[in-house]
Amino acid sequence: MSLNLPGYALFFILLVASSGAKPAPDLQILEPPLSSLEEQEEMQEEVQEKVQEQQEEVQEKVQEQQEEVQEQQEEVQEQQEEQQEEVQERGRGTGDVLLRAQLDSSTWALQKDDVLMRLFKDLLRTSKRSRSRYKKGGLRSCFGVRLARIGSFSGLGC
């Protein structure tokens, strides 16, 4: 390995020139690090003041939101009370509560009768052909009556 110093120098110069890096013209522009305790204490006080201001702002926002929520809850309660009063007035004026209980029991008996009637009508509507498919607990097999023998012989029966 031979050292090619002029080649490396030329590469470095081209690299710096292409990147556009320039040395700082005035080193006094850069601020020196905080060296005194007084400056550090001043910075801490400023930070604490900003934190307190932000906390106060957050507390104010929280209080405003709580007040809004309370107002909304009160409105909802008022609406519920109004609705309950309306329902009570309707129920008291006509005596519907007793009639509803009586109708519910009688409609239940009518519903039972309707269900049985529908079942019998459905059974009467079915054709004899479809009724013959069902024997002692349903279809003979998943293939039907004619294909039951073929399915059982082939091993494909259900």
From Swiss-Prot:
Q: Looking at the keywords, is Disulfide bond present?
A: yes
Record field: compositional bias (Basic and acidic residues): 47-64
Q: In terms of domain of life, where is this protein from? A: Eukaryota
Q: Where is the composition biased (Acidic residues)?
A: 65-86
Q: Which GO terms describe its biological process?
A: blood vessel diameter maintenance; cGMP biosynthetic process; receptor guanylyl cyclase signaling pathway
Principal localization? secreted
Indicate yes or no for the key word Methyltransferase. no
So where does this one cross the membrane? none
Any GO CC annotation of this UniProt entry: extracellular region
Q: Which residues form the propeptide?
A: 22-136
Q: State the signal peptide span.
A: 1-21
Tell me the PROSITE patterns matching this sequence.
NATRIURETIC_PEPTIDE
Record keywords? Cleavage on pair of basic residues, Disulfide bond, Hormone, Secreted, Signal, Vasoactive
Per the record, the similarity remark reads: Belongs to the natriuretic peptide family.
Query: What PANTHER family is this protein classified in?
Result: C-TYPE NATRIURETIC PEPTIDE, C-TYPE NATRIURETIC PEPTIDE 3-LIKE PRECURSOR
The task this protein performs is described as:
Exhibits natriuretic and vasodepressant activity. Has cGMP-stimulating activity. May help to regulate body fluid homeostasis in a variety of aquatic environments.
This one is known as: C-type natriuretic peptide 3
Record gene name: cnp-3
